[in-house]
Amino acid sequence: MDKQDEKKQGTTKSSSTLTTRCSHGNHISQSNSIPLDITIEILSRLPAKSIVRSRSVSKLWSSITTTPEFIKHRSKKTSPPCVLLIFRKHDKLIVFSSPQHQNTYSHVQDYHIEIPKNGFIRRLDSVHGLICLEGSKQLVICNPTLKRFFPLPEPQGTGDEYNVGGFLGYEPIEGKYKALCIVRGWNTQVLTLEIQESWRVTKPGYTHWPTKDTGRCINGVIYYKAIIFDRVPRHVIFGFDLRYEEFTHIEFPMRNYDRFLMVSYEGRLALISSTSSVVEIWSLEDAGNRKWSYEQFHLCLPPNTSLKGVIDAGELIYTGFSLNRSFCVVYFDPKKNNIRETKFQGIADNQIWQPDRLGFDLVNDFYVLPNHIESFISF
């Protein structure tokens, strides 16, 4: 075989193609072959709903769209971050999604997700497209894009009663999801998702228990409020580095820490407190030296609004305490001293408005998750 023929053969072998066949009675005709990379490109350009549906249409498409290569490729084409408004009603999560940079009126997309048995909500946050729910003895991962739940293995030493607290994190350098679990306050364990492995025991240095507040994953570190059971119990902020799997703890920069919401602000850990007229922001400037900075801003908000979070652009998110015919979300930019509103259409017509024997509580049954992105990952 000469070099030219060898080159042609090598080219043929390295070229992956997708061949489709059409059957008419006993006659089978072969259509033009579609290169695999073109198929991936076509599928990656589809809307999220279409990609999810394609998995049930074709086994080949299902295998393609579940590979790490496709998921990584699709993430580069993902839609802009959105804000999720999640209402819990009985065993359902009613989820509304809308672009968080849209002004005036926004028509929301909504869908319902059945909560698995023994799954309940105490802390809720969107971590790189996934949401973590706490079960009685295990953690459950929810992918809103796929509308699916993925129960994690039960941690070691859970016993018969509820004693599990946990958080989900994303390590951006290695691109890995990890779950952190605290069992009975002294047994801390970590699990790498996507890998068939068991929980690994870690040592935080202190016996502690997370508070009911939501944790935050910022630049590969899970931060959460906790109580250290030392000689005198005290409240601190724990940090868990996902890459090196090491713990640190940080003292609060103020005494009245209960009224401060822990968020990611300008890419850093921050504690924010807000009334209708004043916003206070403590930002962790230097985690190694425990150095905080303090800022105060004045604003004029509508009455009966509550701070729910911060979007990546630095705007603070507020919502009301009641459901009106046009549900409104208020955004405040402290740096620009600018306020904008988005009124959501479609929420008033949803079944959360239907009469309910148990009623509905916007304080305990309503969650706002900013900076949510699409994810096609499954476990």
UniProtKB/Swiss-Prot annotation:
InterPro entries in alphabetical order: F-box-assoc_dom_typ3 (IPR013187), F-box-assoc_interact_dom (IPR017451), F-box-like_dom_sf (IPR036047), F-box_dom (IPR001810)
S-S bonds: none
Instruction: Please report the stretch or stretches of sequence annotated as the F-box domain.
Output: 28-74
Q: Which Gene3D superfamilies match?
A: 1.20.1280.50
Superkingdom in the source lineage: Eukaryota
Compositional bias per record (Polar residues), positions renumbered to this chain: 11-26
One Pfam family from the UniProt entry?
FBA_3
UniProt-annotated stretches for the region Disordered: 1-26
Q: Which SUPFAM superfamilies match?
A: F-box domain
Descriptive protein name: F-box protein At5g18160
Organism field = Arabidopsis thaliana (Mouse-ear cress)
